[in-house]
Amino acid sequence: LGNVVTSQTWLKFGTPESILLLLYKRITGARELGFEDIPSLMDEYNELEKIFFGKIKIDNEAKLVKSRGLYEYVNLLNPPKQIPAQVSYRLLLELCKIFKEDRVSRINKKLIDYHAIKETSPEINKLIEMAGNFADEFDISDEIEIDIDSKVKGALSKLVILLEKDEEIEDLQNEIYQIAKGDDVEPKEFFKVLYQIILSTTRGPKIGPFILDIGKKNVGEKIGRYVK
């Protein structure tokens, strides 16, 4: 993988499949990729896996064939027979920033609370360990470009004000829902934008409890950067 990015070091933070995905992208002429790309490569692999097993429907036949072929390639033409338990790497990163002591068991408990997993497994434990290594080693703000219309921006601004208050919020999930409805924004669409801002993905755990877990002020600052 070159002088700076060695496969041995990479495997502290990401799976062998993510290395193969990296190599494929390099072969196809992508920009130079490094450790900072591990979160997006890990989550891209999850998406390829969902496409391969039919959990994500792709109408474009060419894209479907390409995605399925790429998934087989990164699994060395021997893909698993059924979809393994999955957790968003970026979700794990956010949790690893909070939980430093007894990390694996505490994050497993949160993942079960969020209904992200049904039970613990060695594979999930390994993912938590890798995400923990990444969170401890790098401080990378993984922001993506999001097209946000004025109505949604207005609702986001109100949410920022709410999150910046020092008082305890009893039912943040409902408060977020009411802010969206009050600004004539479809709650489902509002939640999707929040996941994009916080996790760079379109879905995630129940948003209210998750925001409280990773810190209201922290999330408020993140959202604030998108509504300026």
Model-inferred region functions:
Residues L21-R26, G34-D37, D139-I144, E170-Y177, ...:
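Short coil/turn segments at secondary-structure boundaries
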Residues H115-E167:
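Aromatic-anchored, charged helix-turn/loop surface patch used as a conserved interaction hotspot
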